[in-house]
């Protein structure tokens, strides 16, 4: 089903094992990661655009995405609320800054969807079927994971220290377990094998990874479902962080999943203060590490 599902993870661990002190090289890697993300998302859109019966597929995808987002939202927020009750965390008052530009953040959140849309239109109207597209996408994903492994290793973060951050570790575990429970509940609804549904539930907001990995394994339609599920998670997170973080920071930080260490971090910092930053980085880092592992393991069972 998925060619070397576990093999795809090897570049992530290889990159994480390599120390790299050259700041100029890390800058190049940063921009390379961004370019690869949009390239991969464009290929995902290309696959969607070249599906037979595209209109019917898209209407079916809309229902699947809504169900997936809703069930995961309820399960994640319930588990994060329970964790907050068990291990309450109170942001330090006086550290909160002014809100960042939500217009800029919203537009940034639309960029990945635009990349998929461009690919979809190109596949539907312009380009003939490209037999090598799947191989190219898999290769690009492996290169992306290698670069991300390098970034994680050289971000000045100690895995031991991250694991010792009880709030960050607890948030990551709560989100992971509740997502898998939600996946179990969704098995009869999505009508997929249990391991494929659990893979869908393991994106944790990492849309560029989940979209292409799920698409490679289950076809472009399910890749689109995984992508939209994780993009919508990111957008919802941006909306709820300022509303929840002062009273229930675990819920505000945790729902964003893997995005807590990058895309949603500025909102967490400005709304919750400095005390929330180490927790967000720890939980986001751990979920970024768990997501490809869980997806690879579950998809390899098919």
Where are these regions (language model features)?
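Intrinsically disordered, low-complexity non-transmembrane regions of multi-pass membrane transporters
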Residues: 1, 22-29, 81-118, 258, ...
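Structural signature of hydrophobic alpha-helical transmembrane segments
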Residues: 1-13, 33-34, 64-75, 132-147, ...
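Entry/N-cap segments of selected transmembrane alpha helices
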Residues: 3-12, 55-79, 108, 112, ...
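Alpha-helical membrane segments and immediately flanking helix-loop junctions
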Residues: 45, 50, 196-236, 247-282
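Membrane-interface helix termini and inter-helical loops of multi-pass transporters
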Residues: 51-61, 125-135, 158-160, 188-189, ...
